[in-house]
């Protein structure tokens, strides 16, 4: 797993007035404030979560 790919994402939008499931998805991505950056493994599950809230996050870096 030394070669495991990671992805950095940044929250750029607020979850205010968004559906509850989108808020929960942001929490699952370890994001809770605008401007926060988190690094997660690049898996299909994480990619799916990013797709669900693509309007609230941006990909900063892919390794």
Swiss-Prot record:
This is Large ribosomal subunit protein uL30. PANTHER family: LARGE RIBOSOMAL SUBUNIT PROTEIN UL30M, MITOCHONDRIAL RIBOSOMAL PROTEIN L30. HAMAP family: Ribosomal_uL30_B (MF_01371_B). GO terms for biological process: translation. InterPro entries: Ribo_uL30_ferredoxin-like_sf, Ribosomal_uL30_bac-type, Ribosomal_uL30_ferredoxin-like. Belongs to the universal ribosomal protein uL30 family. The keyword Ribosomal protein applies. One of its GO terms (molecular function) is structural constituent of ribosome. It comes from the Bacteria. One of its GO terms (cellular component) is cytosolic large ribosomal subunit. Part of the 50S ribosomal subunit. Keywords: Ribonucleoprotein, Ribosomal protein.
């Amino acid at each position: 797993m030394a070669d495991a790919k990671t992805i950095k994402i940044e929250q750029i939008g607020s979850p205010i007035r968004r559906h509850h499931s989108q808020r929960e998805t942001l929490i699952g991505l370890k994001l809770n404030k605008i401007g926060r950056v988190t690094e997660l493994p690049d898996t299909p599950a994480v990619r799916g979560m990013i797709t669900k809230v693509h309007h609230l996050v941006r990909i900063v870096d892919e390794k």
